[in-house]
């Protein structure tokens, strides 16, 4: 079978959001196109998604986070004394060794991207999706300036059990069992489900949200997570994706989201959530060596998860350049996805399931979205999931929803606000 041409690969990318390079295992992802496959009547606003690494006044793919050049006349400034680099401590040396091991792999993946000229040309237009007019994009930007709901705070007040979300089902969906086209259900500590084949528009406290087809969410704090555990193991999950709010001083400074002490995550009932045929567990981890050792030595063993592989997310700007220097110690332009297998019984889930062996050191590349927003890589993991093709998927600490996914967290509706999602033009 002939390998696809460059034009065919680009054509597939424009439809799916996934670009597979020739003679490379690296993959480029456009999260907006991937997410849009979850919706029937709506689309993710590319202007809203790519809010950081595109300049609002420059559509040529230049980053607004690039550091401006210093003025030529700087004689009045006092020259700062260069600090001598201090020697690395033992933990930092281990982290540096990890980095040096993966560095050639990341460099090769980045060189592959820079050699894909047709893809690079397409990247410049990621933020100006032709499905929306300039006026619609400006309207979306104005919405983003409005205050959004703080679900974490709402869930803590005494009125939280009284808050209801109204689901407005499309007329061609058969939901007569609910007594009409609109139903209202508790939004906290409750399974909110859209079993239909179309997106559902929802309203909560005068804010509008879009619920993708075939999706479900449960919004609560950590102490209520046991409510996710199924009564029967056959109703468990084959794919569990986790993006914990790790302890992070930077996140506290930016006030983007609340974090939790790392040891809190030891209590996650991963084994009880696992399907009888086993589960692939995918855990997002930062590059802090202390955290990596915690995951390897304590967290995975406490969950009963057997380590399988590590994937790497390489972050680039719209021009294809890395968002920071590869060797910048505290701000590396990549993050890790640590993968392992969980089973209900003391069996080797890898041998039992007969699924495709999971490769190590897979690299996927994308332009980052909002702070700490991860690219939607769930579909890329499906071939490594144990069990039947009817995969039950769960995301923990989710901040957005996806078709076919069950999502839990204290703000799973965050990116479902209509300031991030616009109606398809054909529906206007």
Task: List the model feature ranges, each with a label.
Residues 1-242, 246-266, 272-274, 288-428:
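Class I S-adenosyl-L-methionine
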Residues 277-286:
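Conserved beta-strand signature within the Rossmann-like core of class I S-adenosyl-L-methionine
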């Amino acid at each position: 079978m002939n390998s696809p041409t460059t034009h065919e690969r680009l054509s597939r990318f424009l439809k799916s959001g996934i670009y597979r390079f020739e003679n490379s295992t690296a993959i480029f992802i456009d999260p907006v196109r991937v997410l849009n496959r979850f919706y029937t009547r709506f689309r993710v606003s590319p202007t809203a998604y790519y809010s950081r690494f595109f300049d609002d006044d420059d559509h040529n793919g230049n980053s607004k986070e690039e550091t401006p050049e210093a003025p030529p006349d700087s004689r009045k400034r006092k020259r700062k004394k260069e600090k001598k680099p201090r020697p690395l401590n033992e933990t930092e040396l281990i982290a540096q060794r990890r980095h040096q091991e993966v560095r050639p792999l990341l460099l090769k993946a980045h060189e592959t991207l820079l050699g894909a000229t047709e893809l690079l040309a397409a990247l410049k237009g990621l933020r100006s999706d032709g499905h929306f007019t300039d006026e619609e994009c400006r309207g979306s930007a104005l919405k983003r300036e409005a205050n959004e709901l703080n679900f974490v705070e709402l869930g803590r007040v005494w009125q939280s059990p009284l808050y209801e979300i109204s689901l407005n089902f499309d007329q061609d969906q058969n939901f007569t069992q609910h007594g009409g086209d609109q139903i209202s259900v508790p939004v906290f500590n409750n399974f909110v489900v859209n079993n239909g084949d179309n997106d559902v528009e929802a309203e909560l406290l005068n804010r509008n949200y879009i619920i993708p087809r075939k999706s479900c969410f449960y919004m609560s704090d950590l102490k209520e997570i046991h409510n996710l555990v199924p009564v029967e193991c056959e109703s468990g999950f084959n794919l569990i994706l986790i993006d914990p709010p790790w302890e992070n001083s930077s996140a506290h400074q930016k006030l983007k989201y609340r974090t939790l002490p790392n040891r809190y995550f030891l209590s996650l009932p991963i084994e009880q959530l696992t399907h009888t045929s086993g589960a692939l567990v995918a855990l997002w981890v930062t590059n802090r060596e202390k955290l990596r050792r915690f995951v390897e030595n304590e967290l995975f063993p406490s969950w009963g998860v057997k380590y399988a592989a590590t994937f790497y997310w390489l972050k680039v700007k719209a021009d294809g350049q890395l968002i920071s220097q590869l060797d910048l110690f505290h701000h590396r332009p990549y993050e890790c996805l640590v993968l392992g297998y969980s089973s209900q019984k003391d069996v080797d889930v890898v041998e039992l399931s007969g699924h495709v062996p999971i490769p190590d050191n897979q690299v996927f590349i994308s332009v980052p979205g909002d702070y700490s927003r991860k690219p939607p890589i769930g579909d890329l993991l499906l071939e490594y999931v144990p069990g039947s093709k009817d995969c039950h998927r769960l995301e923990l600490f989710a901040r957005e929803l996806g078709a076919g996914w069950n999502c839990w967290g204290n703000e799973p509706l965050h990116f479902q606000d209509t300031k991030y999602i616009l109606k398809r033009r054909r529906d206007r």
